[in-house]
Design a protein with these regions (language model features):
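Glycine- and hydrophobic-rich flexible loops that cap the catalytic core of alpha/beta enzyme folds
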Residues: 1-215
């Protein structure tokens, strides 16, 4: 029987409202400032250029549908770091931008960790507040209920990096608001990922090992 794997481009809106499962063989979120800033700068350069109708393509996200506790989830075989960064970016950006462009107040998807279930709701705690002495916009670290967990430190640090990047040059908020949530067929600039959904009858961990051996 033929294996009907799916490979296509998906824009950011097509990633939303899905449930992503991060299995035990994946390491935690570990993007440093440099990696987060590289993504932000690359997107802003694309948004600023004369590229109407073109798209910025992120690296692949590889998933496989699995059943967990009688629910359908998408097990993330490759692309966890990108998927997590996009979610953190949306949590920060939507608080800065949504009222200005008539977009829904929040864009989101669910990420569940096999080995760290207690921090599943951490992304919903990312909140912008004002520093009393300077009135500067900052990430409210008092909302972090998991300060001793290494994953939470990286997630909150990424949120702070993203917020500071937007506040350093606020026109970036406008540019992201114009293009970040565009669909594939919008006719304007959009952000897309290479989406690969495998239906192979194999352990996803084996697929993960095979893919990483080729990198």
């Amino acid at each position: 029987m033929a294996i009907n794997n799916i490979m296509q481009r998906k824009a950011i809106p097509e990633l939303l409202n899905k449930k992503y499962y991060i299995p035990e063989y994946q390491r935690g979120y570990r993007w440093e400032d440099k990696q987060v800033l590289n993504l932000l700068d690359d997107l802003d350069t694309f948004f600023s250029g004369d590229t109407k109708g073109q798209f910025y393509c992120l690296q692949p996200i590889v998933v496989k549908e699995v059943t967990i506790d009688n629910e359908k989830w998408l097990e993330v075989i490759d692309g966890q770091q990108r998927l997590t960064t996009i979610l953190i970016l949306m949590k920060v950006f939507d608080q800065l931008n949504a009222p200005k462009f008539g977009l829904p107040k929040t864009h989101s998807y669910t990420i569940r960790y096999a080995t760290r279930p207690s921090i599943q709701n951490i992304f919903d705690t990312i909140s912008i507040t004002s520093e009393p002495s300077t009135n500067k916009a900052v990430i409210d670290e008092s909302k972090n209920q998991w300060p001793g967990m290494i994953d939470s430190l990286y997630i909150y640090n990424a949120a702070k990096t993203i917020l500071n990047w937007f506040m350093d040059e606020q026109p970036r908020i406008f540019r992201y608001g114009q293009y970040f949530y565009n669909t594939v067929n919008s006719g304007d600039k959009s952000v897309q990922v290479v989406w690969y959904e495998t239906n192979e009858d194999k352990d996803p961990h084996d697929i993960f090992n095979r893919m990483n051996s080729l990198k």
